[in-house]
Amino acid sequence: MKVDFDSLNNIFFVGIKGSGVCSLACFLNSKGYFVEGVDVPDKFYTDDILNNNEISYYENIYEFSLKELDRSFDLIVYSSAYDKDGLQVLLEAKELNIPILSYSEVLGELSRKHYSIGIAGSHGKTTTTAFLGILFDKLGLNPNVIVGSSVKDFGDNSAIAGISDIFIVETCEYKKHFLYFSPNMLILTNVDYEHVDFFKNYEALEDAFLQYINNLKKNGILIINSDDKNLLKIKSQINREDINIFSFGSRDLSNFQISNIVVKNEYFCFSFLGLYNIELRTVLFHNILNFSAALLALNLFLESNGKSIFDFEEVVKRVAKNYSGIKRRSELIKEKKGVIYMDDYAHHPREIRATLFGIKNFYKNKRIILDFMPHTFTRTKEFFDDFVEVLNIADVLILHNIYLSNRENFNPDELSFKLFLNIKKINKNTYFFKDVKDSINFIKSLLISGDLFITMGAGNNFILHDFL
């Protein structure tokens, strides 16, 4: 279904607390549309984003009726986390002939109207999108940006509503949602087997990425991370002569190599694209790759418009050095009584490994206390042995019951406790609390000066920081 956004006034979002849906709601709100929504009463970090944008929302999604609204709406946008045919509000909208689009369909519609840059990958797409949005914004290019988290450089917002034709968007591979998007430029950060409830094997996931590459507009630009062997395999299967492919990475397999990588205090320093001694404020090596992907995209865009990245060298280096992070990505929450408190969204074994090793390497003398909440039954079951291995990197581990997605109806108790028992055999400093809040007093008794406490996962254990 195609929608003329110029003719719309009021847009209602079903599942408005989802990271991407929230960002889209904020984006369209900033564009002048009247926006409201509905979701569950559970607290998410997106509550703060919506409240800061003065977007009102209901919290009774399973009982909600359009009759509760005091105005009519021109469009209903829904999150794929919910069954389109299972919610009363969507069934009512269908009966009333109100246009209904998924979040991904709306992004697709918008992408066809702009010079669109899509960022995709199993890991790092949120950070890369944020980096690219910050760079374009600080260079005065007035971009439109939608990213799946709160970005401090956006004023703790998750979207920028610019006045240019540039549309920078984080796009997701789950259920092939990114196939709605039609980019002029596409950045691929990496590919890892994930979303096992939908992709029955790695080959199915790989095929989805190849399909996405085929969505590139004619003479489009593809940027890939050549440090990722799976992306190199995908690159070898591309059968389009009308697109331009560029690679970057820390090895000499790439067209554009990152070099001179050293750690200096809280910065990673490196050289890229002829810019020397870039100081990136981060504790994680993979953020060098994410920033370099964004920098390469910016450079290619500038060159196509008769400019050079060297014209903006001072601004680029300032962005890197002053980078203040994004919500739930190795986020420093606070320091209190000698304890560092952090939060991270990592929920796949590869992400967990990279984040924990990065933190251990940076904070060499800290005891790492990890509070982890597994996310989705299917992911935990599929990567069970990998979770056992990577969660042992922490010095002390606190586990909780699996946080199920809205699409799952499994009982998580048995698998959650099995994960705990298997890790406990290897690391005796492993503890289990089915409910997050039941662990508060234990954690308080555990922490001493010199510790680093980090909550991790795509569940809701981040709420612990409100009590510690």
From Swiss-Prot:
Catalytic activity: UDP-N-acetyl-alpha-D-muramate + L-alanine + ATP = UDP-N-acetyl-alpha-D-muramoyl-L-alanine + ADP + phosphate + H(+)
GO cellular component, one term: cytoplasm
Domain of life: Bacteria
A UniProt-annotated Pfam family: Mur_ligase_M
Keyword Cell division among UniProt keywords: yes
A single GO molecular function term of this UniProt record: UDP-N-acetylmuramate-L-alanine ligase activity
Entry protein name: UDP-N-acetylmuramate--L-alanine ligase
